[in-house]
From Swiss-Prot:
Gene giving rise to this polypeptide: fam76b
Family: Belongs to the FAM76 family.
Biased composition (Low complexity): 147-159
This protein's GO CC annotations: nuclear speck
InterPro entries in the cross-refs: FAM76
Function: Plays a role in hematopoiesis and immune system development, and participates in the inflammatory response.
Annotated protein name in UniProt: Protein FAM76B
Organism: Xenopus tropicalis (Western clawed frog)
């Protein structure tokens, strides 16, 4: 009977259910062609349509509508399209109140989601990025423990089969010896004359068995030591998994610190850019003010000179008028008798 085939959600070709991915139901070729990557702005995972596409659809729409985003004042993720906070932090602040310090990255960007949210991260108060990294580490450790458990179960089953085989052999040998002794008893009951010789033979066989049994005992006594070695292996494996968890946590911390450094560098670059723009604007305004001041000074000087010229002309006119009046008065005095 042929197994049922299921369609890939991307190329719509039919494959067995085991070959498709769990979440997106994608085939192997589509998983390679369209991998799941993180958005450069909001840091959320999305399926990449093309290799050049590094922004999710939501952020692309926001970029078209509001322009390039700024870093959020809480989480420093470059996703603040409106105002100084990203949409995730604004919604969390409305729902859970003001942010608190994250126990992992020590930033003021963790929102207390009460018992429901803390239960998923072992009661720790973590921000969004740190919760994602912590869940990833827990998932990896669970998968490793499952694989280690399967290997231990296989080894224990093989050791149990070996024990059963050894026990069956020992039981078969004991059963054969019991049959041999019963046959000796039957012979002794039938013929009482050679009783002593048969007893000697049976005594010899019993002494041989007694001498042989201690040789076999160490093998049986060696088994718990094997159990102890398996427990030692389990302890070393658990120590290895703990070390792996610590290493993965440290790697996640390094990655988060690198992200923080990149974001800080970007904010510093943006601030430097703003400073240069402000300096250029200040110099431009200063030059404009100087030109205006020079123009106003020149205009003022010209105006003063014009006023002084007018004043001189008026003084001349006043002097001329005063002379004319004197002349008229003297002429009138001479002609009057």
């Amino acid at each position: 009977m042929a197994s049922a085939l299921y369609a890939c959600t991307k190329c719509h070709q039919r494959y067995p259910f085991e070959e498709l991915s769990q979440g997106q139901q994608l085939c192997k070729e589509c998983r390679i062609a369209h991998p799941i990557v993180k958005c450069t702005y909001c840091r959320s995972e999305f399926q990449q349509e093309s290799k050049t596409n590094t922004i999710c659809k939501k952020c692309a729409q926001n970029v078209k509508q509001f322009g390039t985003p700024k870093p959020c004042q809480y989480c420093n993720i470059i996703a603040a399209f409106i105002g100084t906070k990203c949409q995730r932090c604004t919604n969390s602040e409305k729902k859970y109140g003001p942010p608190q310090t994250c126990e992992q990255c020590k930033q003021q960007c963790a929102f207390d989601r009460k018992e429901e949210g803390r239960r998923k991260v072992d009661g720790k108060l973590l921000c969004w990025l740190c919760t994602l990294s912590y869940k990833r580490v827990l998932q990896k450790t669970k998968e490793q423990r499952k694989s280690l458990g399967s290997t231990h179960s296989n080894s224990s089953s093989s050791s149990l089969t070996e024990k059963d085989q050894h026990h069956s052999k020992h039981h078969h040998h004991h059963h054969h010896h019991h049959r041999h002794s019963s046959s000796h008893h039957k012979i002794s009951s039938l013929s009482p004359e050679p009783e002593q010789g048969i007893w000697k033979q049976s005594h010899k066989s019993s002494t041989v068995i007694q001498n042989e049994t201690p040789k076999k005992k160490p093998k049986l006594e060696f088994k718990p030591s094997n159990g102890d070695s398996s427990s030692i292996n389990q302890s070393t494996d658990s120590g290895g998994t703990d070390n792996f968890v610590l290493i993965s946590q440290l790697k996640e911390e390094v990655m988060s610190l690198k992200r923080l450094l990149q974001q800080r560098d970007q904010t510093i670059l943006e601030k430097d850019k703003k400073l240069t723009e402000l300096k250029a604007d200040f110099q431009y305004q200063e030059n404009n003010l100087r030109t205006k001041m020079n123009g106003m000074d020149k205009a003022h000087k010209d105006f003063v000179e014009q006023l002084q010229g007018k004043n001189r002309e008026l003084l001349k006119q006043v002097a001329a008028l005063s002379k004319g009046k004197k002349f008229d008065k003297s002429g009138s005095i001479l002609t009057s008798p």
